[in-house]
Swiss-Prot record:
Lineage of the species this protein comes from: Eukaryota, Metazoa, Chordata, Craniata, Vertebrata
Family: Belongs to the venom Kunitz-type family.
UniProt cross-references to InterPro entries, sorted A to Z: Kunitz_BPTI, Kunitz_BPTI_sf, Prtase_inh_Kunz-CS, TFPI/VKTCI-like
Disulfide topology: 31-81, 40-64, 56-77
Signal peptide: 1-24
Entries under PANTHER family matching the protein: BPTI_KUNITZ INHIBITOR DOMAIN-CONTAINING PROTEIN (PTHR10083:SF383), KUNITZ-TYPE PROTEASE INHIBITOR-RELATED (PTHR10083)
One cellular component term from this protein's GO annotations in UniProt: extracellular space
The BPTI/Kunitz inhibitor domain, residue ranges: 31-81
Pfam families: Kunitz_BPTI
Protein name: Kunitz-type serine protease inhibitor homolog beta-bungarotoxin B5 chain
Localisation per UniProt entry: Secreted
Organism: Bungarus multicinctus (Many-banded krait)
Length: 83
């Protein structure tokens, strides 16, 4: 296959991947974990992915421990887990 053909194929695959919703792609397993504030009491706002609604919601994070379903911004949460 010529380099032009390979480039076209790569472009089409990239385009199709962008159109595929996250729900049908493999989602990070930690996106399904419940929010976990951890054992500390620093009380910072963070975001977690709520799998039933497929939305990112705010919760109070204690500042240490917890699990990986925790994001500093709603945007990072949505890009990682919601799409």
């Amino acid at each position: 296959m010529s380099s032009g053909g390979l480039l076209l194929l790569l472009g089409l695959l990239t385009f199709c991947a962008e159109l595929t919703p996250v729900s049908s792609r493999k989602r990070h397993p930690y996106c399904n974990l419940p929010p976990d504030p951890g054992p500390c009491h620093d009380n910072k706002f963070a975001f977690y992915h709520h799998p039933a609604s497929n939305k990112c919601k705010e919760f109070v994070y204690g500042g240490c421990g917890g699990n990986d379903n925790r994001f500093k911004t709603r945007n990072k949460c949505q890009c990682t887990c919601s799409g």
